[in-house]
């Protein structure tokens, strides 16, 4: 791909709750990225299995992806690996 799909992790209080209780991670992604491209990029970059991707275009003009990981992968462990906290 000539552009990066994932820009950076999206860190908010809601994102932390999703990570703790629903095994989800949130990312700011390129506005041209499809759900499939986001899933492939997350699986490739972070070596996890993605179950579902939901996307949202924010009022700020960014595109946000909420990625649910499989039960075999721990969102908190992945977040600590990528430097969220």
From Swiss-Prot:
Among the GO molecular function terms of this UniProt record, one is: rRNA binding
Keyword Chloroplast attributed? no
Keyword presence, Lipid metabolism: no
Q: Which GO terms describe its cellular component?
A: ribonucleoprotein complex; ribosome
Query: Which GO BP terms, alphabetically?
Result: translation
Q: Which UniProt keywords apply?
A: Ribonucleoprotein, Ribosomal protein, RNA-binding, rRNA-binding
- SUPFAM superfamilies to which the protein is assigned, alphabetical: Ribosomal proteins S24e, L23 and L15e (SSF54189)
Annotated function: Binds to a specific region on the 23S rRNA. Located at the polypeptide exit tunnel on the outside of the subunit.
Q: Which HAMAP family match?
A: Ribosomal_uL23_A
Q: Which family does it belong to?
A: Belongs to the universal ribosomal protein uL23 family.
Subunit organization: Part of the 50S ribosomal subunit. Interacts with protein L29 and weakly with protein L39e.
Q: What is this protein called?
A: Large ribosomal subunit protein uL23
Q: Which gene encodes it?
A: rpl23
